């Protein structure tokens, strides 16, 4: 593998700064759709995540606040919005839920192959009750079918024989990230996308969602 197309880090960094940096570095995108590299299993509630999926050119209309109502100052603008979250996956071993913030992470490697457009997360983990597993998360966005975002999870149990449950979520009303302390981003949490018609076809979940003001919709 040519080194200039490959980047890898090791270790279970849990700082807020490291997690947000990892979401940026290990994102998946193809020019049409982009997904930040947040952990599939999520973070504890005390951590901030800029969890997001975006479609290029898919926008809504929002008010542009001005200090004064003067002639020539714009009052509305277009804004990109966070579309439905389809990357979240809970992993349960019996009554224990997998998380890098609990138990013991014996090995954590995270990499991105820029030539193939693939990100990998490899983990050797021991649960608080001693269940030992290996996990590999493999993700990519397709350059052949641009709307396609793929996730592959490989799980190997080493000393546990019992129920393993993976719960994949499809959340249709994601909100745009906000941080009142950061002047670079919005200070108010805003929801631009609203789910209209959720339903399932076999193992496939579908959610039709519409923007609040631009009149755009997606499924």
Q: Which functions belong to the PLM regions below?
A:
Residues 2-219:
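Beta-sandwich/jelly-roll carbohydrate-recognition scaffolds of carbohydrate-active enzymes
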């Amino acid at each position: 593998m040519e080194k200039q197309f490959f980047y890898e880090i090791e270790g279970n960094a849990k700082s807020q700064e490291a997690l947000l940096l990892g979401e940026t570095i290990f994102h998946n995108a193809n020019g049409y759709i982009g997904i930040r590299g947040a952990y599939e299993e999520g973070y504890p509630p005390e951590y901030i995540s800029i969890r997001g999926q975006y479609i290029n050119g898919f926008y809504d209309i929002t008010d542009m606040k001005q200090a004064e109502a003067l002639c020539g100052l714009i009052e509305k603008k277009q804004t990109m919005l966070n579309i439905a979250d389809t990357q979240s996956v809970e992993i349960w071993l019996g009554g224990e839920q997998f998380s890098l913030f609990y138990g013991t992470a014996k090995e954590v490697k995270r990499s991105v192959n820029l030539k193939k457009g693939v990100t990998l997360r490899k983990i050797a983990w021991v649960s608080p009750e001693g269940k030992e597993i290996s996990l590999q998360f493999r993700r990519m966005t397709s350059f052949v079918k641009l709307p396609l975002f793929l996730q592959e999870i490989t799980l190997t149990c080493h000393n546990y024989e019992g129920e393993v449950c993976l719960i994949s979520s499809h959340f249709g009303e994601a909100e745009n990230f906000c941080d009142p302390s950061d002047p670079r981003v919005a200070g108010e949490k805003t929801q631009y996308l609203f789910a209209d018609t959720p339903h399932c076809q076999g193992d496939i979940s579908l959610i039709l969602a519409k923007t609040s003001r631009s009149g755009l919709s997606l499924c």
